[in-house]
Amino acid sequence: MAKTVFITGASTGIGATTARTAARAGWNVALFARSEDKLAALADEIGGAALALPGDASRLADQEAAVARAAEHFGGLDAAFANAGRGMTTAGTVEGDTDDISSMVDLNVKGVLWTGRAAIPELKKTRGTLVLTGSAAGRRHIQGSIYSATKWFVHGYAGNMAEEMREWGGRCTVIAPGMVDTPFFDEGKPDKLHPQDVADAVMHALEADPRAAIREIFLMPQT
């Protein structure tokens, strides 16, 4: 029976590339993001192994409903990839727009928490894996960066969840990439990491032998 992974932020970039990669590896993919059109197009591209689940990752109710539907549709859940996230238009505690700050914190912090809260009950049944998109920015101090601070949270949460989940045979991995060439940036970054690099890291964490707990994968561009 094919395994199933729930992916937030699945419509573009790292999420979409991970979905394609997982499907090629024989996984079912539950695709969660706000863009219904992009999700539908990706699900059509992947075929029967994909299920489009539109919703807002910063809303717990949306994620809980999506996880429940995915588990019912595919017969369970083996992994969840909390990938949804965003940056700020103008960085800085004083300079940044307050609504922009709130929206980013809701998605980058609460969105990750809600993926864990929604998915853990299903993952306990399969001794599954929770994967989080962290960042190289969450491993060092960056002057005035609130985005970086949200990623510090992700890294701390990942470590805490790894300890909690090991009690019932589950695993938690944080993927910490440097700059990735995705729609996150207005201009292309051809000399940086490709979304495929991150997708490959996610799959390595998901498909590692159960005896191995991969806590963190740190990726940086070679050039």
Question: What spans do the regions from the language model cover?
Answer:
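Conserved glycine-rich cofactor-binding loop
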Residues: 11-12
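Conserved glycine-rich Rossmann-like NAD(P)H-binding loop of the short-chain dehydrogenase/reductase
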Residues: 25-42
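The beta1-alpha1 cofactor-binding region of Rossmann-like NAD(H)/NADP(H)-dependent oxidoreductases
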Residues: 54-65, 98
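Substrate-binding pocket helix/loop in short-chain dehydrogenase/reductase
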Residues: 91-93, 97-103
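Active-site helix of classical SDR
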Residues: 116, 150-151
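Residue(s) in the substrate-gating loop at a strand-loop-helix junction
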Residues: 135
